[in-house]
Each structure stands twice: as C-alpha cells, then as structure tokens.
C-alpha cells in the first residue's frame, strides 16, 4: 500500500505542476484570455471605423450633395457665381491692426 500511495502522490504532484507551471497551464490561459479581451476591443474599434467608411461610401454613391460637401470642405471649391468670404479670428485681426514700433520709427524718419 505504501508504494501505491507514494506513486499516486508523485503523480498528483506532477499533474499540479503541469496545471500551474507547465505549457498550456493556468498562466498561459490567463495571458491568452487577456489577449482575447484586448483583441475584441480592437475589433470593435475597427468595426465602427468600417461602418463609418461604408456610410460615407453610400453617401458618395447616393448623389451629388455628399460630393459637393466634400469638395467644399476639403478642397475649398465654390460654385460659379458664388462669393467666398474668409472669417479671420479676432486675435489675428488685432495683431494686423496694431503697428509695430519698427514700422512707426521708420515712418517718422522718412518725413
């Protein structure tokens, strides 16, 4: 009986080692499980991006409005007979109106 018990304990120890520390053990399972979660997140982002691209393709295939909007926004195109007005931000407008000291001094010396 003693030899059988010893053999079973050795077998149990080997199985526990394989389960916890061996190839395809608990550590590998946890690592792969985390990798799967990360990959599912990436897949969800890519799926959303693909849906947006398919919607954009459908808009472009659907008619002239989407093509016209894209030409206006991305290429700055206008229709014949339209006027284009560029709005300058307030900070740039103030900087353009205030004369610098070098311009003032050069104007005074020329008179």
UniProtKB/Swiss-Prot annotation:
Part of a complex composed of FtsB, FtsL and FtsQ. GO terms for cellular component: cell division site; cell septum; plasma membrane. GO terms for biological process: FtsZ-dependent cytokinesis. PANTHER family: CELL DIVISION PROTEIN FTSB (PTHR37485:SF1). Residues 97-111 have a biased composition (Low complexity). Gene3D superfamilies: 1.20.5.400. Residues 1-3 are cytoplasmic. InterPro entries: Cell_div_FtsB, FtsL/DivIC. It is found in: Cell inner membrane. It comes from Pectobacterium atrosepticum (strain SCRI 1043 / ATCC BAA-672). Keywords: Cell cycle, Cell division, Cell inner membrane, Cell membrane, Coiled coil, Membrane, Transmembrane, Transmembrane helix. NCBIfam families: PRK00888.1 (NF002058). It holds the Pfam family DivIC. Residues 88-111 are annotated as: Disordered. This is Cell division protein FtsB. The lineage of its organism: Bacteria, Pseudomonadati, Pseudomonadota, Gammaproteobacteria, Enterobacterales. Residues 22-111 are periplasmic. Its main location: membrane. Belongs to the FtsB family. Essential cell division protein. May link together the upstream cell division proteins, which are predominantly cytoplasmic, with the downstream cell division proteins, which are predominantly periplasmic. The chain crosses the membrane at residues 4-21. Residues 33-63 form a coiled coil. It is a single-pass type II membrane protein.
């Amino acid at each position: 009986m003693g030899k059988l018990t010893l053999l079973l304990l050795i077998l149990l120890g080997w199985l526990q080692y394989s389960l916890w520390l061996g190839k395809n053990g608990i550590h590998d399972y946890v690592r792969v499980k985390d990798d799967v979660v990360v990959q599912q997140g990436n897949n969800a982002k890519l799926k959303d991006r693909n849906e947006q691209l398919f919607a954009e393709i459908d808009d472009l295939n659907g008619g002239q409005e989407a093509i016209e909007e894209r030409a206006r926004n991305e290429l700055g195109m206008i229709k014949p007979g339209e006027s284009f007005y560029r709005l300058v931000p307030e900070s740039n407008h103030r900087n353009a109106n205030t004369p610098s000291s070098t311009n003032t001094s050069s104007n005074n010396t020329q008179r």
